[in-house]
Regions:
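Asp-box/BNR beta-propeller blade signature and adjacent active/binding-site loops
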Residues: 1-190
Length: 190
């Protein structure tokens, strides 16, 4: 962060390494350059009705009803000092949170799936994900997050897929679709 706090976030995959299943998004903080770390804590939870992606495979293991919180992406805002944080739920909904205290607390998740809906005129996705990895902030202040979209017909519902970005010009208040990389070109569909 701008204050020098290190934030380590990850998917905590319980009961296996697969992309679908009981997955939480966890965070640890360090304020001393990584010499010590806070306890791990779950930071992504969506209140209310969540739903399950219809393309989700049958889940096994200790909790077959568990949800998939996936693909976390963070951006440290050099201008405001905020930490912008995006994640997906069940590869079908995307959410945005913000921290103004170096990751100690985060705002309630805001559904930003509407940005992905803007892609539908070019690509009729059934599976979406932010990232993986990190987003960036441009000099103009624009926040840019890599995303991928899939038709969900192969590869554990992750294929065929294309890559793009979503972006915000108002510090995360609203999000919009970027351009799909090499649209309508079969050679670039994963």
């Amino acid at each position: 962060t701008r204050a020098g706090t290190l934030l380590a976030y990850a998917e905590a995959r319980r009961g296996g390494s697969g992309d679908w299943g009981s997955i939480d998004i966890v965070l640890r903080r360090s304020t001393d350059g990584g010499r010590s770390w806070s306890p791990q804590r779950i930071i992504a939870r969506v209140p209310g009705e969540k739903g399950r992606n219809p393309l989700s495979p049958v889940r096994k293991g200790p909790d077959p009803e568990a949800l998939t919180y996936n693909n976390p992406v963070a951006i440290a805002d050099a201008q405001s000092g905020a930490v912008h944080f995006l994640f997906c739920l069940e590869y079908m909904r995307a959410f945005y949170m913000r921290s103004d205290d170096d990751g100690r607390t985060f705002s309630k998740p805001v559904d930003i799936t509407g940005a992905f809906e803007e892609f539908r005129k070019e690509y009729a996705w059934k599976v979406i994900a932010t990232g993986p990895g990190h987003g960036i902030q441009l000099k103009s202040g624009r926040l840019v997050v890599p995303v991928w979209l899939a038709l969900g017909t192969g590869g554990n519902a992750h294929r065929p897929s294309v890559a793009s970005t979503i972006y915000s010009d108002d510090r995360g208040a609203t999000w919009h679709a970027g351009e799909i990389a090499v649209p309508h070109t079969r050679e670039w569909v994963n």
